Amino acid sequence: DLGKNHLFPGVLVENGGYAAIRSGVKGTFHNVAAAPIDDYSISCIMGAAVKNEGSRFSIDGGIELIFTDSRLQGVFGYGVHPESHTGGSGNTVSRAAGKEHAIRIALENTSFFCIAGAAAGGTVNGNIDISADNASKGKNNWGDFYRTGITGIGSGDNLYLPIGAVTVNGDINLSLFDDSCNTVYGGYFFTNTGDAGFVNGNISITIRDSGSR
């Protein structure tokens, strides 16, 4: 039970700092429970996050977050710390040698509010792969929790973040099986920081046996 904490399996960079990870960020979670969204329990779970303008990070080896049998609010490969509301354009996440994905998020039998591969300004060198299998079925009785959204590039709308757009040098792949969610975006860009967002690759969305709209 994570209570009212935020979870950063990889790195949190703040106060104008810089962090570099050379072997990637990987987290596997089972039976992680968050309180109802009305309690503002977990604003987000991120492989990496920036907290102040000017902070940035570089991750070689990619980010991978896997959840089973859990109840979550937001899951981001990388993004913006919810207390800061500022992003940065110097973030770079690159895939490991021999792998196609730079960011992978997989949910199984897990309820959520929002999933995003990347939700802050920066560059992703490699594919963004997001998959949800039996996500949000039979677990959502918390009102807004059921209003779920999946996006390859994060809107972050549940956090109301003024975030920069993301450039993806690769493909975005979204796969939903036996799920129930309201909104699915291949790419959803906020450009209010003045940056444009690009996907230099393909966007693929697969939905099967899902109550999505």
Question: Model regions: which residues?
Answer:
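Surface-exposed loop/turn motifs in large extracellular/passenger domains
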Residues: 1-213
